[in-house]
Amino acid sequence: CDFSFIETQRLYQKIKNYHFTPAAVISTIFMKTLAQYSETPGLSINVTLFNRQLLHEDVNGILGEFTNNAVISYQEKTDSLLDAIRATQEQMWRLVQYRKFEGSNILKMLSSGRAGKAIMPVVFTCMLEGNVSKVTKKRYSFKEEYAISQTPQVVLDHHVRDDLGYLKISWDY
């Protein structure tokens, strides 16, 4: 699903007016939808955190894996959608504070005694700065034609990204 540039900018402005991040809004709506369709009032999902730390002045020029993972939860309540987004936003701010903690350790702790079973089969991958050079604001020298991610024990990976101001949403399953 691709949003137009105007739709994306309008959405971002509305989100900004509420002092939320797009990641918090989109992930909350995603979890709310999962909870409703699975008839499960509470659930947790695996969140991909981009963790490129400025260890060297040229680190942004390095192509590589700079991710970590964490877990966020959703609990269906009678509260408003705004309250649910606020709760997700608070969780995300906490995740940023502890981003140096290896998320794989959390998954190991959760999997204790559950050999062979998927622990967090739903993933939310959010890249709202896309493949844009912050210096030139131009696309890099490559164009994505097709993409798919395949990860063991992941049933659904919800991708959200911003490509030069166009919000793009996709699912790998």
Walk through the language-model features, giving the residues of each.
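His-Asp-centered acyl/peptidyl-transfer active-site segments
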Residues: 14-27, 37-145
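Histidine-centered acyl-transfer/condensation active-site motif
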Residues: 22, 159-173
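DNA breakage-rejoining catalytic core of tyrosine-based enzymes
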Residues: 1-8
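Low-complexity, glycine/alanine/valine/leucine- and proline-rich hydrophobic stretches
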Residues: 139-164
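Regulatory/sensor and coupling segments of signal-transduction and defense proteins
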Residues: 11, 128, 172
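Generic structural detector for well-ordered beta-strands
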Residues: 2, 73-75, 159, 172
